């Protein structure tokens, strides 16, 4: 701020001087906007990948998150820990795949029955109920169920790659190429799977998923 004194009128005038000149502000603004847009894009991508975890069986993801630090010894693996971690990932991955073929049925009394979709209809696990043939056929196995099962398996793989304990267990000293792959691959899988699930949403409400209103 500059203060000018008008000697003839005896009036003190204040003139405001901008802290940054227009030239510097116009030169810096595009970089700021560009960085902000990039940060938003990256944040949205990671948020999309995180939201995909909601498409996985809740119990499977919870079990993996609880057992991962134990099996990996918080990322400091020996041969036994590495074997246990591989076994944990395999079991949870298979669980995500196979549970994609489960569905639920709520009867008039409000009781929920879980079962597997088959090529003939719906097989209730505990045999507590028997659905009419026409209703059972509406639950039968379809090709899209296999697509959803594969996508669930891939999404779980992305969740595993975001787990630093597992990554440190199998890659304690990763090369630059491996670090780049471990960073970009889960994001790519998340974007691809989100597009598939958005285009072909699942209608199943199986074990570990929200209940069906049917």
From Swiss-Prot:
It comes from Arabidopsis thaliana (Mouse-ear cress). The chain crosses the membrane at residues 52-72, 83-103, 143-163, 178-198. Involved in membrane remodeling. This is Protein DMP6. It is a multi-pass membrane protein. Belongs to the plant DMP1 protein family. It is found in: Vacuole membrane. Expressed constitutively in leaves, stems, flowers, siliques and roots (e.g. root hairs).
């Amino acid at each position: 701020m500059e203060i000018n004194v008008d000697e003839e009128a005896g009036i003190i005038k204040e003139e405001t001087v901008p802290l940054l000149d227009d030239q510097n502000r116009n030169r810096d603004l595009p970089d700021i906007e560009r960085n902000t847009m990039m940060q938003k894009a990256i944040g949205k991508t990671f948020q999309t990948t995180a939201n995909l975890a909601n498409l996985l069986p809740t119990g499977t993801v919870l079990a993996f998150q609880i057992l991962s630090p134990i099996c990996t010894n918080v990322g400091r693996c020996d041969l036994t820990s590495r074997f246990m971690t591989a076994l944990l990932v395999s079991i949870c991955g298979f669980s995500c795949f196979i549970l994609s073929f489960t569905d639920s049925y709520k009867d008039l009394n409000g009781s929920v029955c879980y079962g597997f979709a088959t090529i003939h209809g719906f097989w209730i696990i505990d045999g507590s109920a028997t659905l009419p043939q026409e209703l059972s056929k509406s639950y039968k196995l379809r090709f899209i169920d296999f697509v959803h099962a594969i996508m669930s398996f891939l999404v779980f793989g992305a969740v595993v790659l975001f787990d630093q304990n597992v990554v440190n267990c199998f890659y304690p000293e990763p090369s630059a190429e491996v670090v780049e792959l471990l960073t970009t691959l889960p994001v790519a899988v998340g974007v691809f799977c989100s597009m598939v699930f958005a285009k072909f949403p699942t209608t199943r409400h199986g074990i570990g998923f929200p209940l069906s209103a049917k």
